[in-house]
């Protein structure tokens, strides 16, 4: 991956968004072919974007029917949206006649209207194997009536399989999302001092995100300090941070639909941590890099997961150490923690993981750390570069390429 600017320029190759859309669509077609599907009905907004490049209006909770995408075997995608004129005007890669009204699938009548429009476009494919990514109780009753000759299968599994390995342009988007997140982190750190509220720090990070073009934040985002770090509380409050507090920061920016996501824990103020605090941070830190070290071809996601919540290596996790894939959805397969046997898969180059262990004890402190890492052929590609709090790292891990290079405090 290259660490270049965000703009399109004529003097070097950067992200080719047309190529990215074409390659994503081909991966979806390949996943459909592997599953033997004739038609794919997609209602998750992030996956509508994956198939069509349509950026939808977003809210704090999912709104079923905001947009949809239909992918017929051997055909071009259909985009279903409330923003018909916008899409037809600004998305020339989707034929105008393939932009349809939004899918009103919250009622039986709305579902029938949507189905009739789809059948008029795809013909006999509506009588084959149809993958659907969201299957509410209502849809489970209405769709079989609308497509009486069809066989329904899990469309979410199909689209997740398509997204599992990132293209080169997707990897570049992910890196830029991480770079924006790092910038937000730095702005936050520049203002981390006794007397500031958790929510004030988060607002500073969000402002930097927005200034650099972030579309959204990876979640409500977390600045968690003092007693809220152990037991761990995963949201931001109005607490005033005090000198010596451990401060967990878990934030992520969004670049063109791809989500940055990583976590660090810092000591507030010009003060050294205790030996107990250093030991807990080291537990989380070692677990993080030992798990990241497994992200190579030839391993499985279970090899990553075995380090998380391990009774010997990560005994103070409270069961909170975890990890997940990421892309156009900040939480998507492959998973790495609490795996059932059927969820264990071989790692392939280009898979992406967010790995986030925790270690903490009430009265001492809590320590959540997180990196994003791509699976590599020979070694993991850990592209989260923000260093850890030097005061909390006793022994620098060989895979940590930043911490220790600017150590300012004694062990």
Predicted regions: what they are:
Residues 1-411:
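Active-site neighborhoods and metal-handling regions in enzymes and metal-associated proteins
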């Amino acid at each position: 991956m290259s660490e270049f600017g965000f703009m399109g320029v004529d003097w070097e190759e950067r992200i080719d968004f047309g190529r990215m859309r074409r390659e994503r669509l081909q991966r979806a077609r390949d996943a459909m072919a592997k599953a033997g599907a004739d038609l794919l009905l997609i209602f998750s907004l992030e996956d509508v974007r994956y198939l069509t490049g349509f950026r939808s209006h977003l809210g704090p909770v999912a709104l079923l029917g905001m947009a949809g995408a239909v992918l017929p075997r051997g055909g071009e995608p259909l985009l279903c949206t409330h923003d018909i004129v916008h899409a037809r005007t600004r998305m020339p890669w989707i034929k105008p006649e393939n932009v349809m009204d939004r899918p009103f699938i919250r009622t039986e009548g709305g579902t029938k209207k949507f189905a009739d429009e789809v059948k008029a476009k795809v013909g006999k494919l509506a009588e084959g194997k149809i993958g659907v990514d969201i299957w509410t109780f209502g849809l489970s009753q209405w769709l079989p009536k609308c497509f009486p000759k069809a066989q329904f299968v899990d469309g979410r599994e199909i689209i997740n399989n398509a997204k599992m390995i990132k293209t080169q342009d997707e990897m570049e988007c992910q890196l830029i999302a991480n770079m924006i997140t790092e910038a937000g982190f730095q702005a936050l750190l520049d203002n981390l001092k006794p007397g500031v509220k958790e929510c004030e720090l988060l607002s500073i990070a969000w402002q930097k995100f927005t200034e650099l073009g972030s579309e959204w934040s990876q979640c409500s985002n977390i600045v968690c300090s003092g007693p809220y770090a152990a037991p761990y509380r995963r949201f931001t409050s109005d607490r005033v941070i005090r000198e010596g507090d451990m401060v967990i920061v878990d934030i992520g920016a969004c670049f063109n639909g791809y989500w940055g996501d990583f976590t660090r824990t810092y000591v507030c103020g010009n003060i050294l941590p205790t030996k107990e605090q250093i030991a807990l941070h080291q537990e989380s830190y070692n677990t993080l890099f030992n798990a990241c070290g497994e992200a190579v071809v030839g391993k499985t996601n279970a090899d990553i997961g075995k380090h998380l919540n391990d009774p010997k290596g990560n005994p103070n996790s409270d069961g909170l150490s975890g990890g997940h894939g990421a892309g156009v959805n900040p939480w998507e397969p492959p998973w790495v923690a609490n795996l059932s046997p059927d969820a264990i898969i071989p790692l392939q180059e280009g898979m992406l993981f967010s790995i986030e262990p925790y270690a903490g004890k009430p009265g001492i402190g809590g320590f959540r750390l997180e990196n994003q890492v791509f699976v590599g052929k020979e070694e993991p590609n850990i592209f989260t570069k923000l260093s850890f709090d030097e005061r909390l790292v006793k022994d620098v891990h060989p895979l940590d390429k930043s911490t220790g290079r600017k150590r300012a405090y004694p062990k």
